[in-house]
Amino acid sequence: MGHILIFGLGYSAGHLATRLRARGWAVTATTRDGRGGTLRFGDGEGVHAALRCATHILSSVPPDEAGQDPVLATYGEALALAPAGWVGYLSSTGVYGDTGGAWVDESAPLRGRRPARNAADLSWRALRGD
């Protein structure tokens, strides 16, 4: 099975972690304070070690109040070089704006009203070029 590193073990990512563990995955996750057996986001040594052994990486951390993505700002260089075969960003459908009910996917233009979230989406897409 795989080993996923989840940045930001909140509501949605927490449900994913539970399902993956039930399927035999190893799950390492970060929180701001390191609660419940997670890594503290600011624990650079621990996070870098997790980046080196994760087969999959997911961030569910939104941009901060300054509009910066804290994961990319703190660990972007290491993420770009991580050996994981898959890297994902759990964003928001709000980045697509009002589509009038039309289906959207990652190739749809970003028209949302939250420029920071749109910028984070684009930064994650460009991170590894794959």
Positions of predicted regions on the chain:
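Short beta-strand "acidic-cap" motif of Rossmann-like dinucleotide-binding folds
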Residues: 27-29
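Conserved Rossmann-fold NAD(P)-dependent oxidoreductase catalytic core, especially the SDR/UDP-sugar
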Residues: 76-112
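NAD(P)-cofactor binding segment of oxidoreductase domains
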Residues: 52-89, 117-123
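Aromatic pocket-lining residues of Rossmann-like dinucleotide-binding sites
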Residues: 20
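Conserved N-terminal Rossmann-fold NAD(P)-binding element of oxidoreductases
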Residues: 4-8
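Active-site Tyr-X1-5-Lys
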Residues: 110-130
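N-terminal Rossmann-fold NAD(P) dinucleotide-binding loop
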Residues: 13-14
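Adenosine-cofactor binding site in Rossmann-like domains, unifying the SAM/SAH pocket
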Residues: 31-46
